[in-house]
Amino acid sequence: NEITDILREIERVSKLHNVFISGSAHEYTAPWNKQRAEELARKLAGALVHEECRITSGFGLGLGSAIINGALDIIYNEKYRHIDEHLCLRPFPQNIPDPDERAKRWKEYRESIIDETGISIFLFGNKYDAATESTVVADGCIQEFEIAKAKGNLIIPIGSTGYAAKVIS
């Protein structure tokens, strides 16, 4: 039993260098705009890689490219290592016509992504809802928060970015 506890603690501590960045941004509200949001995502990713973290991202709308660019800037300019040591991209599978099957697949996918990490950071978290023709809190980000919380991840919402991140904070 003590050995099992020790192994669990080792696993927990080793995952603290694996950081999941959750977020999407269809829209930006003051004081945020597209440029500032991308700069935040880029600088955050770069700082994490600089500190020897491995970033996992689902390539969220409006933020994914900035996360990649921030990580790659440091990998190429400072680390001279394989990209996989610092960056893991997990874009969500698309073109699943059955909404129930898509929801099930995405939940399983989120669980597998978050299971590999020890810290979850939440930025923005909004999406366009065609039914209401408005921008709403991204339910996927909320689901990722619930999964991360259940798995015991350290949760870091950047509430000032609004939407899901604000709800989580």
Regions found by a protein language model. Give the residues of each.
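Acidic/glycine-enriched connector segments
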Residues: N1-D5, E27-S169
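Short, hydrophobic/glycine-enriched beta-strand segments
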Residues: L16-H26
